[in-house]
């Protein structure tokens, strides 16, 4: 069991199984953005986006990224109180995929 009335940092897929159903008021997520770039990507203002080349942000394809997202979002749904809040940050590379899964 995880202690209550505290802010917990960590991997939700490792920590959430220790948390009872419908017991969390707020979840703040900063998930991987899936930013492995095979070519140059620019923002609308033409500045270059730097990709991420670290293991925690590597996925085989969009399906594996979506599956990973479904796993942690399912756990969020399980532990959030009925009137709880979910705050997910992202970039325009991933936030719409996460939004679709949330719907």
Predicted features by range, described:
Residues 1-103:
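S-adenosyl-L-methionine-dependent nucleic acid methyltransferase catalytic domains
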């Amino acid at each position: 069991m995880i202690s209550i009335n505290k802010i917990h940092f960590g991997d939700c897929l490792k920590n959430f199984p220790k948390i009872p159903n419908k017991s969390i008021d707020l979840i703040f997520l900063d998930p991987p953005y899936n930013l492995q770039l095979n070519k140059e990507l620019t923002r609308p203002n033409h500045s270059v986006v730097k990709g991420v080349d670290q293991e925690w942000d590597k996925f085989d394809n969009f399906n594996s990224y979506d599956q990973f997202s479904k796993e942690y979002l399912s756990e969020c749904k399980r532990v959030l109180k009925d009137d709880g809040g979910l705050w997910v940050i992202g970039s325009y590379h991933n936030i719409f995929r996460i939004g679709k899964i949330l719907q």
